[in-house]
């Protein structure tokens, strides 16, 4: 019985919007520090590019979480959610393809994972998975809110 209570509290903690906001802010800060380290120290331009993209997508995620917390996301248009969903799904699949291609090229050309300086496609591929995570998370959030908008819209039409 107590394990069910503790697991539900744990889920409540990690699913709470404040926790998601804090983790997203932490990811944005990690992204900025990695952008600087890839540019200044390691000169890994492909990983730098994808890190910058992840940071931008994380900023968009933060915007959605803050709108959810302030309950202003309910004022967004249905079409906005559809655009967010389809753009993020497309970007997620492109990033997933980038991940696969980077890992195949890194494996075939025998790039060492431990070699941090210069181009290292292992790191580029890892950042592509982060893009996939954030874009699909945004797409699911947009889909949930678009479904709620559609249900509310149909209830308003039925009442009229």
UniProtKB/Swiss-Prot annotation:
Superkingdom of the source species: Eukaryota
GO annotation (BP), single: heme transport
Gene induction: Constitutively expressed. Not regulated by heme level.
Keyword Cell wall biogenesis/degradation belongs to the record: no
Protein localization: Membrane
Glycosylation sites: 44, 144
Family: Belongs to the HRG family.
Parts of the chain that traverse the membrane: 21-41, 47-67, 89-109, 123-142
Role description: Heme transporter.
Protein name in UniProt: Heme transporter hrg-5
InterPro entries documented for this protein: HRG
Gene that this polypeptide is encoded by: hrg-5
């Amino acid at each position: 019985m107590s394990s069910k209570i503790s697991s539900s509290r744990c889920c409540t903690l990690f699913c709470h919007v404040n926790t998601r906001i804090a983790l997203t802010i932490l990811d944005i800060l990690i992204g900025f520090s990695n952008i600087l380290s890839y540019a200044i120290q390691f000169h890994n331009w492909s990983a730098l590019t994808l890190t910058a993209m992840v940071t931008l997508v994380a900023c968009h995620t933060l915007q959605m979480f803050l709108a959810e917390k302030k309950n202003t996301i309910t004022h967004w248009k249905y079409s906005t959610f559809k655009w967010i969903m389809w753009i993020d799904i497309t970007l997620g699949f492109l990033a997933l393809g980038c991940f696969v291609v980077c890992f195949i090229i890194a494996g075939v050309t025998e790039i060492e994972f431990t070699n941090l300086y210069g181009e290292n496609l292992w790191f580029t591929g890892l950042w592509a998975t982060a893009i996939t995570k954030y874009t699909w998370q945004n797409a699911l959030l947009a889909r949930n809110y678009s479904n709620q908008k559609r249900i509310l819209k149909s209830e308003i039409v039925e009442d009229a």
